[in-house]
A protein has these predicted regions:
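Short, flexible, surface-exposed loop segments at domain boundaries
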Residues: 2, 6, 28, 42-85, ...
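Sec-dependent bacterial lipoprotein signal peptides
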Residues: 1-45
Length: 416
């Protein structure tokens, strides 16, 4: 047990109360049983994840879908993290990006702190973690899936789309950027966001950078080749930046200006880097993903993050690979020591929150917020907001679910 065992009992109770409030707000879009499981786990946790003395501030990290976006904040896993001039924003390779590049549905890693209410946090770093960016080699509108870098990308009714009216319109040869968690070591992805960057042409469109994130296998040091997911890669001339010696089973990110050649021929990449940027030790982490490499305990991995759920609340629910789970607990020497594991129910709609000025106003059924098409014709307007108050320039906060490449608003509020 850490130094909190020497603190007064009243302080410990206050800390547990604060953590409980934090847990209660982690998953507002999830089923009640899931939120309750996380809440109970943190209520019972007596060690780890200790708030800073006397502040109610909980050091934390969240990995998941960008579900809320405003001029000064992002929301991930139900916590609204404020951004400031001190917040570092970067892409998967650690290159600086701007807040204007953030989009709903992106897969984010946020490291920062959360206050005792559990509703608000402060982001120290925000990293965008796309799964892949490249040319579609197969598309199946019936199953809502596409193939990229030989791996399957599965879309759903909650996948945020941009640049295409619907999933069925994605075609072989399109250049897309995909976000979402990987389902297995072969690099199959459950898409939280798909953006079409270029439309298919007789010749594959030129694009600045093709990128792939995946787990390594079949490493051949002599030939300097390996598989990333299902894609054969040559790193002979690549800039290599790794946290440890290259080996099988690592999560890496590769990129090159040129598109990959035909299957079976190694793709000569220009960059090869470790993907996992989380610190080895962290007081509290909330993440979602798909169970892989399941062993008794249960012990498993989420992408390449080892999870020890042997003492976690809800551990008996983890019975097979490819289950989507939510996990909370501290990171200890690179392993997530789960306080709680809970299944994420398939098909539960994701409620997104978007704030900003109205643009391109036509009617309550057709306007934009931060470039996203909005249909508020069936929304509840929170007074003093009304449908009549919708004009270009008025600032709104809307909540809604995905409909095509926009949002169907369920609630509309006016902002100052």
């Amino acid at each position: 047990m850490n130094s909190s065992q020497h603190r007064p009992l009243g302080h410990a109770r206050a800390r547990r109360s604060a953590v409980a409030r934090f847990a209660a707000t982690l998953l507002p879009r999830r089923a009640g049983a899931l939120a309750l499981a996380l809440l109970l786990a943190l209520l019972l946790a007596g060690c780890g994840g200790v708030a800073e003395e006397g502040t109610g501030i909980q050091p934390s990290a969240s990995v998941g879908t960008l579900e809320g976006l405003s001029d000064t904040s992002v929301s991930v896993n139900g916590v609204n993290y404020s951004r400031s001039a001190a917040t570092t924003l970067s892409d998967g390779f650690g290159q600086a990006i701007t807040a204007d590049q953030l989009r709903l549905g992106m897969w984010l890693e946020v490291v920062g702190t959360v206050d005792e209410t559990g509703n608000q946090g402060e982001a120290q770093t925000i990293r965008v973690r796309p799964a892949s960016r490249g040319v579609v080699s197969a598309s199946d509108g019936a199953t809502l899936s596409i193939t990229l870098f030989n791996s399957s990308v599965r879309l759903s009714g909650s996948t945020v789309l941009e640049g295409t009216p619907n999933a069925a319109a994605l075609s072989v040869g399109d250049v897309v950027e995909v976000h979402g968690p990987q389902r297995n070591a072969l690099g199959d992805v459950s898409a939280s966001r798909v953006e079409r960057l270029a439309v298919a042409a007789p010749v594959a469109p030129a694009f600045a950078r093709h990128e792939l994130r995946g787990r390594t296998s079949q490493l051949n040091p002599a030939a300097q080749t390996l598989l990333v997911g299902r894609r054969l890669v040559s790193y002979a001339t690549a800039q290599v930046t790794l946290r440890r010696s290259l080996d099988n089973g690592q999560m890496v990110r590769v990129a090159a200006t040129g598109a990959p050649p035909a299957a079976g021929t190694a793709w000569a990449v220009e960059r090869l880097t470790s993907d996992l940027a989380l610190p080895a030790n962290l007081g509290f982490l909330y993440t979602e993903g798909y169970v892989d490499g399941l062993l008794a305990g249960p012990l498993f991995v989420l992408e390449d993050l080892p999870v020890d759920a042997s003492t976690a609340n809800g551990r008996s629910s983890v019975t097979a690979n490819d289950q989507r789970v939510a996990v909370v607990g501290p990171l200890t020497q690179g392993t997530l020591k789960a306080r709680s594991v809970a299944l994420v129910t398939p098909g539960v709609p994701v409620v997104f929150t978007l704030s900003g000025p109205v643009t391109d106003y036509v009617s309550a059924a057709s306007f934009k917020l931060r470039g996203v098409p909005i249909d508020a014709s069936a929304a509840t307007f929170v007074a003093p907001a009304t449908a009549a108050s919708l004009v270009d320039g008025v600032r709104l906060r809307i909540k809604g679910t995905v409909r095509g490449r926009g949002l169907a608003a369920s609630q509309v509020e006016l902002l100052p």
